[in-house]
Design a protein with these regions (language model features):
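Aromatic-lined carbohydrate-recognition surfaces of secreted/lumenal glycan-active proteins
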Residues: 8-21, 43-44, 51
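Histidine-acidic metal/acid-base catalytic patches
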Residues: 23-27, 31-44, 50-136
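Anion (oxyanion) recognition and catalysis
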Residues: 4
Length: 136
């Protein structure tokens, strides 16, 4: 109610199914929570979907029209709870499929490059991720 009255766009960010209390890792749950809220959107994290074994294209389609910003990752494996980030286009996630679906939806929000690896010097890999987004 507060967001609607004050023109504030709020977004729910999902996390993987780390514990039984967290069911908002599932995009269907988030969609159900926000469907009637005018100013409440989703901030989906495709890396957490991957860790939970949820296909990101399915997630984006489920949340269509209610996505404010995207936390975008590529990961070494799909469905591995202890997954590792890799530069975009070099991992197991369907990066082109995700981008194509977001384009199809007319998504005009922000892509947040979320690279959680190479903690001592992540910049070269983050630049690769940025270049991948520019090309695709």
């Amino acid at each position: 109610k507060y967001c609607g009255e004050n023109g504030i766009k709020m977004a729910i960010h999902n996390h993987a199914a780390d514990n039984k209390a967290n069911n908002y890792y599932d995009p269907r749950v988030v969609k159900n929570l926000i469907k009637d809220c005018k100013n409440v959107y989703a901030c989906p994290d495709n890396g957490h979907w991957s860790r939970a074994g949820i296909d990101s294209v399915f997630g984006y389609k489920t949340l269509e029209g209610k996505i404010a910003i995207v936390h975008f990752k590529d990961q070494k494996e799909f469905g591995n709870h202890k997954n590792q980030c890799v530069p975009f286009g070099t991992g197991a996630l369907d990066m082109k499929g995700m981008l194509a679906d977001l384009d199809r939806q007319g998504f005009d929000g922000y892509y947040l490059i979320e690279y959680e690896a190479e903690w001592d010097n992540p910049l070269p890999s983050v630049v690769k991720c940025y270049e991948y987004l520019k090309k695709n």
